[in-house]
């Protein structure tokens, strides 16, 4: 009598607010817009790594600051869902509740990869 294990593929698709990118493109031009998006994606990637390190080290104060920075950076390039989840994580960290913090942090990490990929693909394709 063995237990059956089911693997649940938890994947979330990123939603991209293309109007933010269009405003950037109109104000900066194609080339500079792409550079800005690449720079923001680099910073988001870096901060996601720092956030994971802070969470693994039980450093809630640093993790909260990083989550808030992730939220504001991601909004600049149209990643509203990612920003909302990052703000949710900051709120969980501020409340000091470990269970929702773990769940929301895992969701942010899942959403992060697809979000960053989506914004880069859109920025490259729309420049054509």
Model-derived regions, located:
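Two-component system phosphorelay core
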Residues: 1-65, 69-76, 80-128
